[in-house]
Amino acid sequence: MKHVPVAAALALFMAAGLASNTGAAPAVGGPVTGDWGFDATGMDTSVRAGDDFFKYANGGWDVRTPIPADKTGYGLDYVLADQAELRVRGILEGAPAPGADGAKIHAAYAAFMDEKRANVLGATPIAPDLAALRAVRTKTEMAALMGRSPMSFESAIFNTGIGVDQKAPDKYAVSIGQGGLGLPNRDYYLQPSFAAKKAAYQTYIVTMLTLAHWQDPQGSAKAIVDFETRIAEASWTRAESRDPDKTFNPMSPAELAKFAPGFAWRPFLNGAGLTGVDRVIVRQNTAFPKIAAIYADAPLTTLKAWEAFHVVDAAAPYLSDAFVDAQFDVRGKTLSGQPSQRDRWKRAVAFANGGMGEAVGRVYVAKYFPPDAKAKIDALVKELVVALGQRIDGLDWMSAETKTKAHAKLAQLTVKIGYPSVWRDYSALKVSAANMAADAEAFDRFEWMRDVKRLHKPVDRTEWGMTPQTVNA
């Protein structure tokens, strides 16, 4: 179904100024302002608002607007994202911005756009990953290799992350959650309604292992799906995993090793570069002993085949068309309902944005968000903060003590508009126009090691969770 805000929001988006959405990269320039006003043609006034408000507000637009073949939904936020995508394309296909970052984002885009080279290389870019996997001789070594998953194409049966400690928001913490599934969630393995998709997934595994020249693709695929099904049975549901209290279980690595034996936790953490970590937050805690036991019980050949498939699956977007097409047929069409693959330039834009989003954003801001526009919005927000303070003062039902606390909370408000005050430093990142698969791993490694290095530092309040070219930034 289409995802669309009600027509009342249309005026806001029209005021934002939408440029023509064509297939060609637009000329790089300044802000573009489109038509102003409320688009009443998006409504369907033949329907009473009280009977069906969605049709009343959006019925005209809904009837006239098909979902593009390369998307699974569409709405005004998608329109804005399409415009930003075209603008970034113009930046990446134009002359590089001065400096090393400008050269790097162009190299990343060029690497992805070189489809001919990708087809010549085939599976060659992942040969080192598969060679390292074939060299594994013990389950302890396998756990160490899985530890590399945040910064490589490798995968793991437990997912590791670094973020703000939810119980101590001035610090960062390492969190570990359940993982190991190649399908979207446990229901795809356990519910009969997903049986066809599970079967398609197993066929997909055969295809990918065959393309990667892994031994016994048919037998390995069955073993992999059986292994993941056992993990699914042990895993928490999505609803359970959203409980902030149940998913906060701090432990030391030694305590975790006793709590969930059967998995080499210290080698796993060392593989992730977390050699000095003495505290981790365990998410779905009751699943951990079960998943660790499943790992301990699995043959090493199954674990290696499982890892091989997930390496290929993670790397597929950066390999030859055979890998790309096989992945899209299952992950795009079968699992997501997306009829057509996105154009290569769109995927290349996403690649550059994903790897060096702030470097792209810095150029984007210079082209499309002039300082005077930011100054005006900053001034407007300051007035809103003042007005909010005045509203607090005028509340009859709020006590003086509560008002004091409300003002203290208001004073701590951090306003972030348009782009960060401190841009990310990409000087340590190496990018090559000749190897997009290596670039993809370099992007992951750069971000992960950046997180590891700041683990014992205070939380950076200036950091942004999105790039300037992201809709809603």
List each model region and its residues.
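Extracytoplasmic/secreted envelope proteins and their assembly/folding machinery
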Residues: 47-54, 58, 81, 85-92, ...
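Noncatalytic, helix-rich "gating/capping" subdomain that lines the substrate-entry/channel surface
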Residues: 95-379, 383
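Gram-negative bacterial Sec-dependent N-terminal signal peptides
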Residues: 1-23
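Surface-exposed patches in mature extracellular/periplasmic domains of secreted proteins
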Residues: 63-69, 98-101, 213-221, 392-407, ...
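Short, Gly/Pro- and small/polar-rich lid/capping loops
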Residues: 26-41
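Intrinsically disordered, low-complexity linker/terminal regions across diverse proteins
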Residues: 259-262, 281-285, 309, 349, ...
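Active-site-surrounding "flap" and adjacent substrate/cofactor-binding loops of secreted or lumenal enzymes
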Residues: 31-32, 48-120
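Short amphipathic alpha-helical segments with coiled-coil-like heptad repeat character
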Residues: 56-70, 206-216, 412-414
